[in-house]
Amino acid sequence: GSICLEPKVVGPCTAYFPRFYFDSETGKCTPFIYGGCEGNSYVDEKLHACRAICRA
């Protein structure tokens, strides 16, 4: 879906939430640290959920 094409957005806050986003350049769900606010509409806590939604 189109949410899988959104870029990774860490956000300006300083929390530490391990998340996954779909990297459209590599075609893989990639880990990153989300700061806890002002992210995009799709970040996932679980690798398997990212893979299922984005078919990675």
UniProtKB/Swiss-Prot annotation:
Residues 4-54 form the BPTI/Kunitz inhibitor domain. This is PI-stichotoxin-Hcr2a. A synonymy between H.magnifica and R.crispa is controversial. CDD domains: Kunitz_SHPI. Belongs to the venom Kunitz-type family. Sea anemone type 2 potassium channel toxin subfamily. Its main location: secreted. GO terms for cellular component: extracellular space; nematocyst. The lineage of its organism: Eukaryota, Metazoa, Cnidaria, Anthozoa, Hexacorallia. Serine protease inhibitor that acts on trypsin. Disulfide bonds join 4-54, 13-37, 29-50. It comes from the Eukaryota. Keywords: Disulfide bond, Nematocyst, Protease inhibitor, Secreted, Serine protease inhibitor. InterPro entries: Kunitz_BPTI (IPR002223), Kunitz_BPTI_sf (IPR036880), TFPI/VKTCI-like (IPR050098). The keyword Disulfide bond applies.
